[in-house]
Amino acid sequence: ERDGDNVSVTDFAVLPHRKVLSTPDIDVAEVTRLSLGQLISEKDLEGEHLVISVPGHSAFARFAKLPPVEKKDLPEIVKFEAVQQIPFPIEEVEWDYEAFHQEGLPEVEVGIFAITRERVNERLDVYGEVGISPETLTLSPVSLFNAMNYDLNLSGAKDPVVFIDIGTQATDVIIATGDRCWIRTFPLGGTHFTEAIASTFKITYAKAERLKQEAASSKYAKQIMQAMRPVFADLL
């Protein structure tokens, strides 16, 4: 909840999916529906402003530096830039931007964020089937930056700060410099570590996933880490 300029967390829930969404042959929509059903059975969401995030690999984040421009002309110039940067016809995407102004410099840097309407509708359909109607959609790396910017007061930081968020299918790298950020998503995530374990030990994906999760306490920790080493090398 908000109290003036302060924000506090009043409640939260962690609801793991019944199966990892990268499990081969899984019905992602059905597993997601089951998790959402569990959420609404535990939390009263009626009347709440619902915000959902999409992973970085499902959307686009592009950054561009613009020449000095009057504030009133910025939206039109950014739209022109968005058409150049987004690899889909502009009428097929939902997009927005954030302008970053650096003190003492006339140039403006903008972050352009977009997702195809097809992907938006796919997600809204799944949410709608369980009676949830999100009002706002954002990108998970943007959410992470906003949270860390607030929690760590990055606007007062002198040096850049790097955040690495390893997801199931991809990894987001967020470089924050004060109130400005740069985001890049790489197609390497937790599923690649699981696949490496499955290949090394000739076991099923599900068993490999369990081994990965229990690696720290397993008597085979050394062998498991050895199996994942090539993926760590690619990530670094």
Protein language model features and the residues they cover:
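Active-site neighborhood for divalent-cation/phosphate handling
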Residues: 49, 53-152
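Non-catalytic, solvent-exposed interaction/assembly segments
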Residues: 1-81, 121-124, 131-133, 159
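Flexible hinge/switch segments at interdomain interfaces of large molecular machines
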Residues: 9-13, 53-54, 97-99, 209-215
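Short, glycine- and charge-enriched coil/turn segments that flank and shape catalytic ligand pockets
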Residues: 3-6, 22-31, 100-108, 151-158, ...
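Adenine-nucleotide phosphate-binding core of ATP-dependent small-molecule kinases
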Residues: 208-236
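Conserved phosphate/pyrophosphate-binding and hydrolysis machinery centered on Walker-type P-loop NTPases
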Residues: 67, 138, 187-190, 221-225, ...
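Small-residue helix-packing motif on alpha-helices
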Residues: 74, 203-211
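Gly/Thr-rich phosphate-binding beta-strand-loop-beta motif of the actin/hexokinase/Hsp70
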Residues: 1-16, 50-53, 151-193, 197
